[in-house]
Every structure is written in C-alpha cells, then in structure tokens.
Regions:
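Active-site metal-coordination/substrate-binding segment of hydrolases
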Residues: 105-173, 455
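An extended, acidic, His-containing surface patch that forms the Zn2+-binding/catalytic region
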Residues: 78, 209-210, 265-326, 330-334, ...
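Short, Lys/Arg-enriched N-terminal segments with co-localized hydrophobic residues
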Residues: 18-27
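N-terminal helical capping/dimerization or prosegment-like subdomains
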Residues: 27-122, 334, 338
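Histidine/acidic-residue-rich, glycine-tolerant segments that coordinate divalent metal ions
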Residues: 165-246
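A short core secondary-structure module
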Residues: 186, 242-264
C-alpha cells in the first residue's frame, strides 16, 4: 500500500479494542438529548443557508455560491472546527474544516454540498423557493434537503459532542455537485492529505420513508449524449413532398422508439444488469410516490427494486425541433434529442455509451444520417456494506430511528463516490442522507422532513461515538 492510499489511522481501527473503552450507554442517552438541544440553532443556520441562492449552474449567481462558501466556513468556525479553508481548483469554492483525532482514534470525513439546483418555474412553488417555509412538519425551499440539510446534519452531530467528538472529524462541503463536480478530482488530488480519512460519510442520499432509514449500498451510473438526425439539406413543402420524402423529426421519433421494446425494457444490446437488494416495494407505493396517472402502467420487467436500482434505463430528456407556435407545413430537415442513460452497478459508463451510440447509428430508419455527440459520464458504484464500520452505522440508525435500516439502492447517480473510492481506497464509505420519498429534490416544492433531520443528526452523532469508543470497530 502506498502512502497516498493509507488512511491517517488505519491501524487505529484495527486495534481499537485495546485502546478504547466500551460504549457508555448512559452517555449515548445524553448524546441523543444534546442533539435535540442544538437542533433549533442548527435549523436557523440551515434557513440562513437556504436564503442564499447558491446556483453554480447560473453564471449570474456564482457570487452567491462564494457567499454561501463564506457562510459555511463561518458556521464551521463557530462550531469549533479549526484549520478552515475555502479551496478551489478552477471551479466553485469548497469548504474544509478539521478537528484533529485523539491519539489512536480514527478520522471521519463528513461530506455535503452547498450548491443547489436552479429553482425552475417560480409560479409552481407554493412558497418562495429561497425563503424557507414550514408546512405540516416539512421545511420547504430549494436546498432545504439537497444538500444544505447535509451540512446541518454534520453541524448538529458535531455540536452535540460539544465540539470534541472521540474521533477526528473533517468536514468537506463541495460547491459544484449539482453541476457534475467537474473539478472534484483535482480538489481530491490537491487536498489528499487534508481529506484523508478512515471512514467517509456522504450525506447526499435518501431514506426508505420518513420513519425508516436507508443505508445506500448501490447507485447507478450516468451516460448521456445528443443524437442528431438529418434527412434533407433544406426544408420542403409537406404538401408537395410529404408521403415520399422522409422528414427528420419522424425519423428521430422512430429511432428513439427503438430504444425500448413493447414492454418498456431497454432494447440496446450489450448493457450490464446487476442484482438488486431484496426489498419489498409494492406497486401502490410506486404509484403514490411518483404521481403515475390512473391508467398509465409501469414499464419494464422484474421487481421494482430490480428495475430502479439494478437495470439500465434510457430516457429522452430533451428534443430540439420546430416549436408548435412556429411550425409550418414543412418537412423538417434536421432534429436532435438528448438521451440520458443510467448504468447498472458493475457496468462501465463509457462502454455503455459506446453501445448506445452503436444502436443509434445502426437503427436509423430510411437511411437517415445520424450523428452522436457524447456528453457526461459518471460511473456506478456498489458498496460492500459489511464489517464492523457498517455494523456500527446500522446500530446508530437503529437507536436513532427506533427501527432497522433498509439496505437500499438508488436509481440516480452520485458519480463522485467513485472518485472518493479511487482517491482513498482503504476508507470505508457510508452513503446516508436526509431525503425521503416526498422530498422532491431537483423539482419545485423541494422540502425537508424536520423529523428526519433530527433522526439523521442523531444517528450521525451516535456513529461518531461508536467509531470512537466501541472496541468492536475495525476495518
């Protein structure tokens, strides 16, 4: 193992039994109480962060992202973190705060991000997107859950320990996750020594419900592209030439339809399929959570978890053609679409994009010319969630939530997890979060369930205690 691969205290996790006392259960009760005590101030801090329109994808609001980074740095300083840095490698500002590990104790890296998605159509929000508003036990606003609540979770857990947890804690708050983390790999390389840890907690996922926590054990990857179809060198009168000469939009529609079979399964050859966790996901839950209209059926074959977490998915997310209000009786010469593909755990995003490209190039109807422009790639990730660190996490969930956590997959992508795994191959990675099925992250009326915030913060505080005190913890 090279020096770059060695966590700061990997031996400490292996020999903790000889160095640290067993958990004091009475102390754990005190810790739960202290989380409740700090939550009101943490919520105020969260609301202040939500009021900052930290949308890195909007160049006009990039100064707000810098203001958000300054606010996060101050919160970390006020909580008792030292060695606070605002860092950048040509992209958005990220914030790092460190609390050194006691002798023999492991170091835990806590990740979140302070940038948010654009808010979309203001008229579709029930309250202003950047003015946090509570309704029915939920806090509404852009970033309340994704992922400024991740920052709040870390702050609450750290403050509950009085700023002196029994482990080293490094908080890393990224500023461009919603834009695909384009400079993260450079940040990890530049800050490798600063960010090195034995355990990495990524608080950017969701939970099974508001009453049942999840430990995310797999995520699909992402590959996208733009396909352009051309049939003519100029538009033609549809009355004079329609029925003889193909138009590009009709060719594009037929090409896109070839991506799925009649049951909605992906019909592209050469794609990988994994095996999903054995979790009960009844159809009525799916309909309730997605807003599927009456009479509209599901697509694909296999269980819901298998289709959501372990099979590839292809979605057409945009089409460029003549808008209806500017349409005329013309055969359209060119049309294009953007295609997003989810890659099952164990697959390779680049290979899947190549397979999709081959399909598009070989299935064009009527000899239409097809040009495929590759886009973003993000690798899938599967976590081997076994061993003492994961046992400690499940115990912390169980104590904080009062029920067993669900090992769940996520159909979406967090590509940077693979980057963390590559940068710190010996670290154990835990993917947690504060979202729930009603959160509506990335959509209008995003919200945070305040009870989930309390339980997530409590679980993280308990986890820090267990990692620092339980003689059973070992890598």
């Amino acid at each position: 193992m090279s020096a770059r691969d060695t966590p700061p205290n990997c031996a400490s996790l292996r020999t903790l039994a000889a160095r640290r006392r067993p958990i004091n259960l009475e102390g754990m009760d005190d810790l739960v109480r202290r989380v409740r005590e700090v939550l009101p101030s943490v919520r105020r801090d969260l609301e202040d962060l939500v009021r900052i329109e930290s949308v890195w994808a909007d160049p006009a609001r990039r100064p707000e992202v810098h203001r958000s980074a300054d606010a996060v740095a101050k919160l970390l300083s006020d909580a008792g973190f030292g060695d606070i840095q605002i860092v950048s490698e040509g992209g958005a500002p990220a914030v790092i705060g460190r609390h050194p590990a006691p002798p023999g104790a492991p170091t835990v890296l806590l990740y979140a991000h302070h940038d948010v998605q654009p808010e979309g159509d203001h008229t579709q929000w029930h309250s202003p997107p950047f003015e946090p508003t509570e309704r029915d036990g939920r806090l509404y606003g852009r970033g309340t859950a994704d992922d400024k609540a991740g920052i709040a979770t870390h702050l609450a857990a750290f403050r509950a320990h009085g700023g002196k947890p029994p482990v080293g804690v490094t908080v890393f708050v990224e500023g461009e996750e919603e834009s695909g983390s384009p400079s993260l790999s450079k940040l990890l390389a530049a800050q490798r020594e600063t960010l090195a840890a034995d355990v990495i907690v990524i608080a950017d996922s969701d939970n099974w419900s508001t009453d049942v926590p999840s430990l995310t054990v797999s995520l699909r990857g992402l590959a996208d592209c733009v396909v352009e179809v051309a049939t003519l060198d100029h538009g033609l009168h549809s009355g004079l030439w329609g029925g003889v000469v193909p138009d590009a939009l009709s060719a594009l529609v037929r090409l896109l339809a070839s991506l799925h079979d009649d049951d909605g399964n992906v019909a592209v050859a050469g794609l990988h399929e994994a095996t999903a966790a054995d979790v009960d996901y009844p159809p009525e839950r799916l309909r309730r959570e997605t807003g599927l209209l009456d009479g509209v059926s599901e697509i694909g074959s296999g269980s819901v978890p298998q289709r959501l977490w372990a099979k590839p998915a292809i979605t057409v997310i945009g089409i460029d053609t003549t808008p209806i209000d500017k349409s005329s009786n013309t055969l359209i010469p060119r049309a294009r679409a953007k295609i997003s593909m989810r890659v099952a755990p164990g697959g390779d995003a680049a290979e899947h994009l190549a397979a999709l490209t081959r399909h598009l190039e070989t299935h064009a109807p009527w000899g239409a010319r097809v040009t495929v422009t590759p886009g973003d790639l993000g690798q899938p990730y599967r976590i081997d969630a076994t061993g003492p660190v994961y046992d400690a996490a499940r115990a912390a969930f169980r104590e904080a939530w009062g029920t067993e956590p669900v090992d769940a997959g996520v159909g979406g992508s967090i590509p940077f997890i693979a980057e963390f795994a590559e940068a710190f191959p010996s670290a154990k990675i835990l993917v947690t979060g504060v979202e729930d099925p009603a959160t509506q992250a990335h959509s209008v009326n995003e919200s945070l369930h305040l009870g989930v915030l309390e339980r997530a913060a409590t679980a993280e505080a308990l986890l820090l205690a267990k990692l620092g005190s339980d003689g059973k913890i070992a890598t």
